[in-house]
Design a protein with these regions (language model features):
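Long, charged, low-complexity, helical-prone intrinsically disordered regions
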Residues: 1-144
Length: 144
């Protein structure tokens, strides 16, 4: 038995256990519950540890359309092994993004793996606006 499994057995009574599909996850019992009715949206850079740090990425690539898109070779990992910047909504990778620069604006081009809802797109727009404020530039969001 590995050290990790021994440690898990010794501390499991102090951990919160959650089973999703056929995978068991453990976490702190002190982790606050997620805020209901509020999405989290992140524009992650290429090679972010959220994807690169795990061999099994099924939890963050769980959507059927996302898996089909990725398996087609069109997204996330390019043929040269480079990871594309991804958009993550509520923990799931739902598209890729890239930035281009015009004379006056940063243009964020979003490629969706599956059609995002109106609420998701509104939240993405808010994140893109904050991105522009951080870089002190106006932003334009283009959606593929």
């Amino acid at each position: 038995m590995t050290d990790a499994k021994i440690g898990l057995l010794k501390t499991s009574s102090k951990l919160k256990k959650e089973v999703i599909g056929d995978i068991t996850y453990y976490g702190s019992t002190k982790t606050p519950a997620p805020i209901k009715n509020r999405q989290t949206v992140h524009l992650l850079p290429a090679f972010d540890e959220y994807l690169v740090g795990y061999e099994d990425r099924s939890a963050m690539l769980g959507n059927k359309q996302t898996r089909e898109w990725i398996n087609s070779g069109k997204a996330v990992v390019h043929s040269n092994g480079v990871f594309a910047p991804v958009i993550v909504i509520d923990g799931e990778v739902l598209g890729t993004w890239k930035r281009t620069q015009t004379e006056k604006n940063a243009v964020i081009i979003l490629t969706q793996f599956t059609k995002l809802s109106g609420e998701q797109l509104s939240d993405v727009r808010s994140v893109v606006e904050r991105y522009g404020k951080f870089f002190q530039t106006d932003t334009i969001l283009k959606i593929n």
